[in-house]
Amino acid sequence: MKTVILAGGLGTRISEETSTRPKPMVEIGGKPILWHIMKTYSAHGIHDFVICCGYKGYVIKEYFANYFLHMSDITFDMQNNKMEVHQRYAEPWKVTLVDTGDDTMTGGRLKRVADHVKDEEAFCLTYGDGVSDVNITDLVTFHKAQKVKATLTATIPPGRFGALDMNGNKVNSFREKPKGDGAMINGGFFVLSPQVIEYLADDKTVWEREPLERLAEEGDLAAFQHNGFWQPMDTLRDKMHLEELWQSGKAPWKVWS
């Protein structure tokens, strides 16, 4: 099974981090958030990835081009022009990197990688800027049982700010960031049939609009309800929050050992 990751956006709301690199390459705990997402899928046995590159996509390509060197113990024999690998720590991943254009919309990016997923029974799709502890194995099983063309992960978004417990004009205590108003949203982490490619017109197609709306109208869109951890990295505040969780040693999305 393959996972397609949308990694071509500009990341304008986190421009402090994205002036020199694409948003999926912003680091959490010294690793790109893209790496964290891939580790989540890999923990569930999915090791084949198609990355939809766009803005500064060469940074992603260079990262994986040098990944083997970064993740191995190596001796370089300069005199004899030899390289000896002592220990390899790299993951068992197959990574296909596709330039899908700087200005292409999400649906257009998926359409541009259609040849890489057209022969799959089903494939996963997600965004390259958010992490979760969603159980991918259960998600895929759910999708197959629903017998639909598309399944999204429905989740309750986290609140943006901490809440105050007050008594009149006095603050009694602080509470952790509450979740939103209780309404579930599209949290990404899709499982799709290759048939969804037929719903994508061109580079201007926004996956979250007409394609998903049509699938819903036709009864071909299911929702896998996830009540666990889910966090996008939309702002610098989000990035700092994820970094704090990682440094605490209790990052909820770290489902791998």
What do these predicted regions represent?
Residues 20, 90-92, 105, 166, ...:
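A generic fold-level signal
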Residues 121-124, 131-132, 136-144, 155-159, ...:
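Catalytic-core segments of class I nucleotidyltransferases/pyrophosphorylases
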Residues 62-168:
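Conserved beta-loop-beta/alpha segment of the NTase-like Rossmann-fold superfamily
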Residues 36, 109-112, 211:
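Well-ordered alpha-helical segments embedded in enzymatic catalytic cores
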